[in-house]
Amino acid sequence: MNSANPCCDPITCKPRRGEHCVSGPCCRNCKFLNPGTICKRTMLDGLNDYCTGVTSDCPRNPWKSEEED
C-alpha cells in the first residue's frame, strides 16, 4: 500500500475519488498534465514526446524512428 501518496487510496492503491492519476510522467498533483505538455525531450527539435491529457503515460512520438528513441 502507498498511503504516503496523496493521490492514492491506501486500500485500493488506485486514484482517490475525483483524482485522475497516482503517478507517471504525465501526472502532477493527481491530475493528468495538459495535452501537448512535453514529457520526454529529445535532441532533435519537434520529436519530443508529449502528454495526451487522458493518461499518465508518456506516449512515444509516432514520427520518431526506432533509432531516435
UniProtKB/Swiss-Prot annotation:
Record key words, sorted: Cell adhesion impairing toxin, Disulfide bond, Hemostasis impairing toxin, Platelet aggregation inhibiting toxin, Secreted, Toxin
Record localization: Secreted
Expression across tissues: Expressed by the venom gland.
PROSITE patterns hit by this protein: DISINTEGRIN_1, DISINTEGRIN_2
A GO molecular function held by the record: toxin activity
Stored Pfam families: Disintegrin
Domain of life, source organism: Eukaryota
Disulphide bridges, residue numbers: 7-30, 21-27, 26-51, 39-58
Motif Cell attachment site in this chain: 43-45
Annotated Gene Ontology cellular component terms: extracellular region
Family: Belongs to the disintegrin family. Dimeric disintegrin subfamily.
Assembly: Heterodimer with VLO5A; disulfide-linked.
Other comment: Negative results: does not inhibit alpha-1/beta-1 (ITGA1/ITGB1), alpha-2/beta-1 (ITGA2/ITGB1) and alpha-6/beta-1 (ITGA6/ITGB1).
Role according to the record: Poor inhibitor of platelet aggregation. The disintegrin inhibits the adhesion of the alpha-4/beta-1 (ITGA4/ITGB1) integrin to VCAM-1. Inhibition on alpha-2b/beta-3 (ITGA2B/ITGB3) is low.
Protein name: Disintegrin VLO5B
Highest classification ranks of the organism: Eukaryota, Metazoa, Chordata, Craniata, Vertebrata
